[in-house]
Amino acid sequence: MFFNRERELEKLLRLVSTEPNLITFVYGPINSGKTALMMEFIKKLPDDHIAFYINLRRTPITSYSDFVDVLFSVEFRNKVKTLKEAVSLVLSAGKETFGFPVPTELLARITKEKKPKNAFAYIVTLMEEVRKAGKRPILILDELQVIGDLKVDGSLIYELFNFFIHLTKESHLSHVFVVTSDSLFIERVYSEAMLQGRAEYFLVDDFKRETALRFLKNNGLSDDEAELVWNYFGGKPVYLAETIKHRDELKEWCERMLKLRTSQILDELYALEKELFEKVVKLFFAFEKQESVPYRSLSEEILWAVKRNILFAEPVDRVLRPQGRLELLAIKRILDIIE
């Protein structure tokens, strides 16, 4: 759902009007509207820009060949025989292309050799040709964390980081946007020495109260109904959009969603051994009277809660908070149940 993200859009558009220098990591709580924002960003790009958009969640990625399949989109298979044809295909695509067109024989070689640097070298060549033709390439990778542990003669993620550094800080060839909802991944990135001075961080958060209420009222909810929804879901875009479908049973639906989330967390909690269970409960008590708490390091209980999308770890400010208001309410109910 895209609504009232003009400030974020303006920042992104201003960023791509300058020379590429830094990798931009776009992050935030789960379902905060990051992908919707990037899709709208692509639509608003000036005509002399073209975005190569790759969603790594589109298909399961468990091997290098899976990664190549997503990188070099199947929609271009058997359509391209030369680099010139690949460039022409990109230039005719408008502002966006899903993946990179690649000559068939070269793709077979890239897949067989299992050397990421060969795939990246081709992408650089393609982008250089696109640039010569008067277009400014932009690379957007959505959900990069899904390949975080994939090994191809070493960690693929580090090969990618080096590639991104080359595209931005070294060659100034392309802006690079990496989108993720995984706060453990962004914490890892934020602490990565090789990215110091080579990356910036762009937070896409849930809507503020004023924005959420305006969206709900614009879609026909009364003041009281909008307040009810805010009290259950805060500014989480996905729930605000779903609310419109359930207006005839609004209170019941909101309560049902809270019961479901509470039950899901309890199922996970009750499966823990006693020591970790007690640590998690103690962590939950930190949110009994406040919505965010500082953290020094990612302890066992924090890792458990973040991996299960109960809590969101914000590495820049080093604070923990529930993934959304629904999780905050569920935590409070759980504390009432287990006391």
Curated annotation (Swiss-Prot):
<comment type="similarity">
    <text>Belongs to the archaeal ATPase family.</text>
</comment>
<dbReference type="InterPro" id="IPR051667">
    <property type="entry name" value="Archaeal_ATPase_domain"/>
</dbReference>
<dbReference type="Pfam" id="PF01637">
    <property type="entry name" value="ATPase_2"/>
</dbReference>
<dbReference type="InterPro" id="IPR011579">
    <property type="entry name" value="ATPase_dom"/>
</dbReference>
<feature type="binding site">
    <location>
        <begin position="28"/>
        <end position="35"/>
    </location>
    <ligand>
        <name>ATP</name>
    </ligand>
</feature>
<dbReference type="InterPro" id="IPR003593">
    <property type="entry name" value="AAA+_ATPase"/>
</dbReference>
<dbReference type="GO" id="GO:0016887">
    <property type="term" value="F:ATP hydrolysis activity"/>
</dbReference>
<keyword id="KW-0547">Nucleotide-binding</keyword>
<protein>
    <recommendedName>
        <fullName>Uncharacterized ATP-binding protein PYRAB09480</fullName>
    </recommendedName>
</protein>
<keyword id="KW-0067">ATP-binding</keyword>
<dbReference type="InterPro" id="IPR027417">
    <property type="entry name" value="P-loop_NTPase"/>
</dbReference>
<dbReference type="InterPro" id="IPR049081">
    <property type="entry name" value="MJ1010-like_2nd"/>
</dbReference>
<dbReference type="InterPro" id="IPR036388">
    <property type="entry name" value="WH-like_DNA-bd_sf"/>
</dbReference>
<dbReference type="Pfam" id="PF21690">
    <property type="entry name" value="MJ1010-like_2nd"/>
</dbReference>
<dbReference type="GO" id="GO:0005524">
    <property type="term" value="F:ATP binding"/>
</dbReference>
